[in-house]
């Protein structure tokens, strides 16, 4: 079997690496996940710094092209292989995808990441949860999710009545959030909850979720 032309470097438990993998899975692209160890400092080795001078993951190699930053990777993959997930070249739809991608990057993800770091990843980092940080960011996330609820009351997906990267991009960090007791923030909002359940049921999302065994840091809400 030929080696896939596309390689992704990183550890799949990372929601950033998994964001890139989700785009590849949705686009049906054959790829190789090149495993790395954060604990062993693989991301600080010269060969990886040559791929990404910031020493972060993921990194994607697509033939002679090397990319870093998970959202840039996802855009490249979909632009090349499944442009309908970016709005399909239609000006207004593409603009709405861009708007809600910016909302995810600057409004949703920062508080969600802060909660997930404390509730899920702090034990792996050898420290206790900082509940003050959690509480502060829960309030921020509530307000963002209320905006999502209002938007999703008017259309099936964030950019309109079509699935796009604007919906897929938050999946991996929300997957981590849903492994904590703060999944209740999503369940409390019917349109957000239905949107989330639809995303989580997608085959590509299911596959990527298997790479992300989260939930060690906090009890999962009982259903």
Swiss-Prot record:
Seedling roots. Homodimer or heterodimer of GST-I and GST-IV (=GST-II). Induction: By herbicides. Residues 90-223 form the GST C-terminal domain. InterPro entries: Glutathione-S-Trfase_C-like, Glutathione-S-Trfase_C_sf, Glutathione_S-Trfase, Glutathione_S-Trfase_N, GST_C, GST_Phi_C, Thioredoxin-like_sf. Belongs to the GST superfamily. Phi family. Conjugation of reduced glutathione to a wide number of exogenous and endogenous hydrophobic electrophiles. Involved in the detoxification of certain herbicides. Most active with substrates possessing a chloroacetamide structure. Trans-cinnamic acid and 1-chloro-2,4-dinitrobenzene are not effective substrates. May play an important role in the benoxacor-mediated protection of maize from metolachlor injury. The gene is GST4. GO terms for biological process: glutathione metabolic process; response to herbicide; response to xenobiotic stimulus. It comes from Zea mays (Maize). One of its GO terms (molecular function) is protein homodimerization activity. Glutathione binds at residues 14, 43-44, 56-57, 69-70. It catalyses: RX + glutathione = an S-substituted glutathione + a halide anion + H(+). The keyword Glycoprotein does not apply. This is Glutathione S-transferase 4. The modification Blocked amino end (Ala) is found at residue 2. Optimum pH is 7.5-8. Active from pH 6 to 9. Keywords: Transferase.
